[in-house]
């Protein structure tokens, strides 16, 4: 051992290393639960069960597809879009267009502000519908199942590609 100890690859180091997923710290945070309860009250949800639509990308009227499929069910439809920077104005425009098209037309449709934490939305829902978003992995931390829709197009390439699960 003494002959090899000077080689950096075999010399053990002592130290403290932090591991984990920073968002997992919020799962048991009472502030997230309190905020979710506050938002539930504020939105005055109609039903006991909530389905969260939280895609990576809003593209090709996916929100419209989701709403048409879920609206007839006796569930709350929660929409939580990602908070995009101005560099992605086309995506922001898609989000705004979908909201303008649907908001106020369904008594079981609720929009969660893009600046709200996704963790709050996950605490509020019973199931998640998404494309290839990491939100599906984050939902597991809340013991919430996810449905990955794999035939939705993702516009991060030219031409747009099909979503890929796992992420």
Residue ranges of each PLM-predicted region?
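Short, aromatic/basic amphipathic alpha-helical patches
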Residues: 5-10, 68, 90-102, 159
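Catalytic binding pocket for nucleotide-activated donors in carbohydrate/polymer assembly enzymes
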Residues: 10-13, 18, 134-167
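Short, well-ordered beta-strand core segments
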Residues: 1, 128-129, 146
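Active-site and donor-binding regions of nucleotide-sugar-utilizing enzymes
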Residues: 1-31, 136
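Donor nucleotide-activated moiety binding/catalytic core segment of transferases
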Residues: 90-137
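Short beta-alpha junction loops
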Residues: 1, 81-86, 151-154
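Conserved catalytic-core segment of nucleotide-activated headgroup transferases in glycan assembly
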Residues: 18-98
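Short, conserved active-site loop motifs that form the nucleotide-linked donor/cofactor pocket
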Residues: 16, 75, 107-110, 164-165
